[in-house]
Amino acid sequence: MKLRGVSLAAGLFLLALSLWGQPAEAAACYGCSPGSKCDCSGIKGEKGERGFPGLEGHPGLPGFPGPEGPPGPRGQKGDDGIPGPPGPKGIRGPPGLPGFPGTPGLPGMPGHDGAPGPQGIPGCNGTKGERGFPGSPGFPGLQGPPGPPGIPGMKGEPGSIIMSSLPGPKGNPGYPGPPGIQGLPGPTGIPGPIGPPGPPGLMGPPGPPGLPGPKGNMGLNFQGPKGEKGEQGLQGPPGPPGQISEQKRPIDVEFQKGDQGLPGDRGPPGPPGIRGPPGPPGGEKGEKGEQGEPGKRGKPGKDGENGQPGIPGLPGDPGYPGEPGRDGEKGQKGDTGPPGPPGLVIPRPGTGITIGEKGNIGLPGLPGEKGERGFPGIQGPPGLPGPPGAAVMGPPGPPGFPGERGQKGDEGPPGISIPGPPGLDGQPGAPGLPGPPGPAGPHIPPSDEICEPGPPGPPGSPGDKGLQGEQGVKGDKGDTCFNCIGTGISGPPGQPGLPGLPGPPGSLGFPGQKGEKGQAGATGPKGLPGIPGAPGAPGFPGSKGEPGDILTFPGMKGDKGELGSPGAPGLPGLPGTPGQDGLPGLPGPKGEPGGITFKGERGPPGNPGLPGLPGNIGPMGPPGFGPPGPVGEKGIQGVAGNPGQPGIPGPKGDPGQTITQPGKPGLPGNPGRDGDVGLPGDPGLPGQPGLPGIPGSKGEPGIPGIGLPGPPGPKGFPGIPGPPGAPGTPGRIGLEGPPGPPGFPGPKGEPGFALPGPPGPPGLPGFKGALGPKGDRGFPGPPGPPGRTGLDGLPGPKGDVGPNGQPGPMGPPGLPGIGVQGPPGPPGIPGPIGQPGLHGIPGEKGDPGPPGLDVPGPPGERGSPGIPGAPGPIGPPGSPGLPGKAGASGFPGTKGEMGMMGPPGPPGPLGIPGRSGVPGLKGDDGLQGQPGLPGPTGEKGSKGEPGLPGPPGPMDPNLLGSKGEKGEPGLPGIPGVSGPKGYQGLPGDPGQPGLSGQPGLPGPPGPKGNPGLPGQPGLIGPPGLKGTIGDMGFPGPQGVEGPPGPSGVPGQPGSPGLPGQKGDKGDPGISSIGLPGLPGPKGEPGLPGYPGNPGIKGSVGDPGLPGLPGTPGAKGQPGLPGFPGTPGPPGPKGISGPPGNPGLPGEPGPVGGGGHPGQPGPPGEKGKPGQDGIPGPAGQKGEPGQPGFGNPGPPGLPGLSGQKGDGGLPGIPGNPGLPGPKGEPGFHGFPGVQGPPGPPGSPGPALEGPKGNPGPQGPPGRPGLPGPEGPPGLPGNGGIKGEKGNPGQPGLPGLPGLKGDQGPPGLQGNPGRPGLNGMKGDPGLPGVPGFPGMKGPSGVPGSAGPEGEPGLIGPPGPPGLPGPSGQSIIIKGDAGPPGIPGQPGLKGLPGPQGPQGLPGPTGPPGDPGRNGLPGFDGAGGRKGDPGLPGQPGTRGLDGPPGPDGLQGPPGPPGTSSVAHGFLITRHSQTTDAPQCPQGTLQVYEGFSLLYVQGNKRAHGQDLGTAGSCLRRFSTMPFMFCNINNVCNFASRNDYSYWLSTPEPMPMSMQPLKGQSIQPFISRCAVCEAPAVVIAVHSQTIQIPHCPQGWDSLWIGYSFMMHTSAGAEGSGQALASPGSCLEEFRSAPFIECHGRGTCNYYANSYSFWLATVDVSDMFSKPQSETLKAGDLRTRISRCQVCMKRT
């Protein structure tokens, strides 16, 4: 608006200058009489040099308001407003073109589990291949015949068990299964017979007695070693006397071998006796006794270690089906086996399926979610007639073909003309017919000195009204009058004129463009009923109707019957309630063709008669033969007329086609009372159709009954015309009138500002140019006049429901419907009308439901548009209908909102040139008008093709011939060869002016003239103002690759930017081990810890020094009674005994201090650029930078000629220079850039001189020398932005400038070389899907079109050839401190691409790139190698305090310490909540959450923290939100993963739902510990010891990491208690989904810390596959320890 105000002010200032300067010019002609010879014009001098800018003038008067400006740029997004009331539903816009293909949608919900594939043939254990993508589980195959024993394959997936009543064939021997759960001891069996004695075993050497071992650790979950020997039992009762060999000699005792006695029961232990003296030495060892009888069955011993697998035994008898075993580890992928034979279907015996009766109809459920779009169903039978639609006229259909000429209608009564309020002044009208010849004016002798014309005279008296002339040719559109001076006061309305004589019939025009939709007219009174027409032929199937309401009555429940044959038609039902007025009836039949009237010869003109009455509408003329004419301008909206009298019904017409236009939905009516329900009658025999009855008077509205809707009633007679309506609203401003006759040239004005002038007149059509580039989308043109009604098109698809129509008149009351009296329901709130749903497939016949309440249900969601059905058959074309009478004009509609800019449509075909109209008579010249104010800048005119110059016309010096009739455009000639330019001719003498002839009477239309020669090219219009920024266009096609631009001078360094956001998580780096850092400095000694509880006994240490003599041991078991020996003398001292037992382990040394911090490692590689983000709003234009300090580079090569710039603002006018002598013609110079248009020249003589012959061509001139540089002018206002020039040639490289501010992101370059795999990035925000451009078809190459706008900057060219290698090797210096930010340098030209230098040192990480658009989902990557163990994470924040736990047992008295607590979480991996360890307090208990996965990204919980123990379980515990303040829950393909229990999966392997999930979810407890808790891992199968001063809380297995869907997952910090699970399972977690199901899947993996032998630490790990039963032999053990307080 500011710009418009400036241009207005400048225009008014110019006007003031021109008015003020007129007396000076008039003085040059002072005293000239009309007959004298004054030379007032002077000799026109050469065009002077542009003067210096003049002083700024005074501000002008305020200008008139300018035309409405173009739409401004989109403003910034405002704050959210208060939600307004719901507005009325807008008018449905026309359907848009099909959009571009959208970006691929987000992944859908996972499909149902596929059927398992057949079991493959076990292959050999191959070498471990690359990890493949996880396959889907196959179906279990049938048991095949036993093959020859192959090499044992890897363990397969557990197969399904098919229960069969018959015993199967004998199976192959299985591998040893894992040990089962220990059963209850069975009853004692009958002792079996004594077996034969086995062969004697080899005698083993007796082993030395071992030392007593230390007490072992807590046992493992699997079979441990045999326990220690128990304590001495009580003394048993005395046994039966044994057979003792006689004593032969007192000393030389010899025992004879006795028989084996029966084992006695164990007696109670006797009291310990007093230690006796040492007994005499016993006798010699007797012989080994014979094998005793087997004793009773002992107690079950502890489980031994797993033995080695034995040799496969012979096949045993088939066993009973075992319990399902635990899931084994997933084996390696075997080779693909050959396809197996087709399996047999083994039905399960004894399970017949009986189909029960159909249940009662249920209560209506809640509206379901919107389903997926289904496939189109098969074509159903035609539905019942739908209820009558609202009587609202739909939008006009497409123009049909012209119908045959109809009969002339009867003359209607004259309408009542209600004058409206006076409209605004219209544009100047077309010139009227010439009046009678006026008196001759004064004769002006021919002379070369013509004075300026005098002031305009008074208006003349109006002439007599002439005859109505033929329709003249439509004139060119006149120039738009911007800033017209003066607003006339509207005059009073004139008297209505007398009717004119009937005009001759016009020729048939072609359909124009569709006009704007008018407002709906006022509803007329109800018409009389019309005579019913004869039934039409059956039409084609209409579009699918709305589903009708189904009212059913309760009956007895029957079985579903077979489909019966069609019954006879029933008796006519009772009359239904009258429907709303129906759509207009079918058109009548084709009438007889009328006679063709020919136009008679034109008679001599008679005297003007009084205007006659308006004639009847003439018969339609014969169709024209020419091609369609151009689109006409939109007509003025007329005032609504009164409805006409009813016409006589036409005779029967051929059946027409019905196009159903959906009307607007009506307002909801008030609910009526329930009617009495009658019993349904039996169907009667079909009766004959009765005659139509006389319409009854309008009754009171009846009570609506419950019943099926009746068929639509017959169309009523047209109604009696209503009273005249109220005066209409004032009409719109009329069309722009044709241009007036040209005035005489005005006096020379002051040099104006070089504002752009209006565009020149259009030239004659040039030769057809080649198809130019596709232009920008223009603003919508004015609507054309309404086209003629076309033939009915084929039925279109059913449209969406339109807006509500006006309520129709109240119909007569209907008869009471039949129905059962329902109970009165509570009044419901009427819901809005829902969208019509698709027809479903007919379901089974349901039981009749109870009658529903008359309450509209809640609106359903709008369904997805269905897939287009198969096209119906094309029906035969209907006969053309009679032309309808002109309807009353509707009220002007409100202008619709400007629609969104549509995508560019395809270029339409070239139209056929129209026939020329009858030439109009030339009008008289008008009086000279005042010069208008300069108009605003027009739109930039398109450059016209130059026409061929015409030859000079014959010249009569006395008479100036009148303008000849415009001939038909000639066919385009073949372009001639370009000849050499002729020499410049001398200017000819001006010719004598001719006398003005009197205008003749209108002649008859002349014959068709010969084609005229092409006219002179029009003047080049000034450039228009820069248009406003349009809406974002769709992506254009790929431009032609532009030439590489010149290199820019490096800018100055900018200020240090703000720290960037956190970069994306990189991909895993190349697995290499970084250099270890230097040891850090020793830390300060810590505070002394709290004394801990006694630790578990340590493992066996190295042999210690000989211990002190031990204390006397416990009494041994009593030996056999010895015989007393003789006491011997004391012997000498014996030799030293063996070393004693190892001593207790020593105290561990103090903890060392922390090391020095290591040096930082080398910087990592630069991460890959992130995905494109959502495009931000357009940034504000930056301020211009300061001039740089760089030295100017050498001058670049001359650039190509730039495109024409826009005209600048005028400078201050300078003093006029003296006219110099005209120089000789120079040599032909290079073409210069076209300058702005010059000021208008002085007026020439008022008479047209003859056109001179073209002069001979002058020799080409030499280029002139460049003039000296002038002084700089005053700074002008900011010019309008010129068009973007073409890129120049590359200049020489400039000096490097300082680094500039960070610019906006550039266009995406060509892809570089593939970088190394970066680390995996965090997920980017999802980008907005772009519109992918569709590649258009290649056009036919045409001849060169006019010069197009410069194209968009092409993508960067390919890299140039490598230049010579550089010389200096850059060595990275130490980074200096950041300097003061310099001024930004001017952007230099880009230099040519230099050679590839040597690789420099790794630079610092770059600025984060903008998020890219989301790419398409790539294929799943291969699983990477496990990364190095990460550093333990920092401890998380303490959670909020939970509710008080149960009262714990009283703790031991603690030492005084500062009160502090640490939260840990213990997971039971069962359905029972775990107990908190001793010394901790329970905070709360919950369910064990392992990790969640959303938007294909996983986020894990540390199982040792409280965050992994959610107090409530849900298969989808989270939801996701976006930037639009919208959150979605359980509506996407997201997952949650929970620790699971040992509960086996059901045999069907179906996903778990509902309450069946609960047994599979592990429970957990959050405990508060008084000190820090850590986990220690042994990396062996031995349980590690807690550090000294720490107490054990629990032991377990070292759980490290887990992955599942999409190879996503998370892991545990090995220092956290969450990395030490108390139970090992190969599948320790279960996957749950947002749809409420959980299941185990084959792509779920758990990762456990493995055992490492000390000797194998730095050698290559050996591949190994462990089967079930051996899994725990390679899994590291761990212990969770708490610091002793």
Swiss-Prot record:
<keyword id="KW-0964">Secreted</keyword>
<feature type="compositionally biased region" description="Low complexity">
    <location>
        <begin position="214"/>
        <end position="225"/>
    </location>
</feature>
<feature type="compositionally biased region" description="Low complexity">
    <location>
        <begin position="1111"/>
        <end position="1120"/>
    </location>
</feature>
<feature type="compositionally biased region" description="Pro residues">
    <location>
        <begin position="1234"/>
        <end position="1243"/>
    </location>
</feature>
<feature type="compositionally biased region" description="Pro residues">
    <location>
        <begin position="848"/>
        <end position="859"/>
    </location>
</feature>
<feature type="signal peptide">
    <location>
        <begin position="1"/>
        <end position="26"/>
    </location>
</feature>
<dbReference type="GO" id="GO:0005576">
    <property type="term" value="C:extracellular region"/>
</dbReference>
<feature type="compositionally biased region" description="Pro residues">
    <location>
        <begin position="1353"/>
        <end position="1362"/>
    </location>
</feature>
<feature type="compositionally biased region" description="Pro residues">
    <location>
        <begin position="266"/>
        <end position="281"/>
    </location>
</feature>
<feature type="compositionally biased region" description="Low complexity">
    <location>
        <begin position="912"/>
        <end position="931"/>
    </location>
</feature>
<dbReference type="GO" id="GO:0005788">
    <property type="term" value="C:endoplasmic reticulum lumen"/>
</dbReference>
<feature type="compositionally biased region" description="Low complexity">
    <location>
        <begin position="983"/>
        <end position="999"/>
    </location>
</feature>
<keyword id="KW-0023">Alport syndrome</keyword>
<feature type="disulfide bond" description="Or C-1586 with C-1678">
    <location>
        <begin position="1586"/>
        <end position="1681"/>
    </location>
</feature>
<comment type="similarity">
    <text>Belongs to the type IV collagen family.</text>
</comment>
<feature type="compositionally biased region" description="Pro residues">
    <location>
        <begin position="620"/>
        <end position="630"/>
    </location>
</feature>
<feature type="region of interest" description="Disordered">
    <location>
        <begin position="49"/>
        <end position="1459"/>
    </location>
</feature>
<dbReference type="GO" id="GO:0005615">
    <property type="term" value="C:extracellular space"/>
</dbReference>
<feature type="disulfide bond" description="Or C-1620 with C-1681">
    <location>
        <begin position="1620"/>
        <end position="1678"/>
    </location>
</feature>
<feature type="glycosylation site" description="N-linked (GlcNAc...) asparagine">
    <location>
        <position position="125"/>
    </location>
</feature>
<keyword id="KW-0272">Extracellular matrix</keyword>
<feature type="cross-link" description="S-Lysyl-methionine sulfilimine (Lys-Met) (interchain with M-1549)">
    <location>
        <position position="1667"/>
    </location>
</feature>
<dbReference type="InterPro" id="IPR001442">
    <property type="entry name" value="Collagen_IV_NC"/>
</dbReference>
<feature type="disulfide bond" description="Or C-1509 with C-1567">
    <location>
        <begin position="1509"/>
        <end position="1564"/>
    </location>
</feature>
<feature type="compositionally biased region" description="Pro residues">
    <location>
        <begin position="431"/>
        <end position="445"/>
    </location>
</feature>
<feature type="compositionally biased region" description="Basic and acidic residues">
    <location>
        <begin position="284"/>
        <end position="305"/>
    </location>
</feature>
<feature type="domain" description="Collagen IV NC1">
    <location>
        <begin position="1461"/>
        <end position="1685"/>
    </location>
</feature>
<keyword id="KW-0209">Deafness</keyword>
<feature type="compositionally biased region" description="Pro residues">
    <location>
        <begin position="709"/>
        <end position="727"/>
    </location>
</feature>
<keyword id="KW-0084">Basement membrane</keyword>
<dbReference type="GO" id="GO:0005587">
    <property type="term" value="C:collagen type IV trimer"/>
</dbReference>
<feature type="compositionally biased region" description="Gly residues">
    <location>
        <begin position="1149"/>
        <end position="1158"/>
    </location>
</feature>
<comment type="subunit">
    <text>There are six type IV collagen isoforms, alpha 1(IV)-alpha 6(IV), each of which can form a triple helix structure with 2 other chains to generate type IV collagen network.</text>
</comment>
<feature type="compositionally biased region" description="Basic and acidic residues">
    <location>
        <begin position="324"/>
        <end position="333"/>
    </location>
</feature>
<feature type="compositionally biased region" description="Low complexity">
    <location>
        <begin position="882"/>
        <end position="901"/>
    </location>
</feature>
<dbReference type="GO" id="GO:0031594">
    <property type="term" value="C:neuromuscular junction"/>
</dbReference>
<feature type="compositionally biased region" description="Low complexity">
    <location>
        <begin position="788"/>
        <end position="797"/>
    </location>
</feature>
<feature type="compositionally biased region" description="Pro residues">
    <location>
        <begin position="1256"/>
        <end position="1274"/>
    </location>
</feature>
<feature type="compositionally biased region" description="Pro residues">
    <location>
        <begin position="493"/>
        <end position="505"/>
    </location>
</feature>
<dbReference type="InterPro" id="IPR008160">
    <property type="entry name" value="Collagen"/>
</dbReference>
<feature type="compositionally biased region" description="Basic and acidic residues">
    <location>
        <begin position="246"/>
        <end position="257"/>
    </location>
</feature>
<dbReference type="Pfam" id="PF01413">
    <property type="entry name" value="C4"/>
</dbReference>
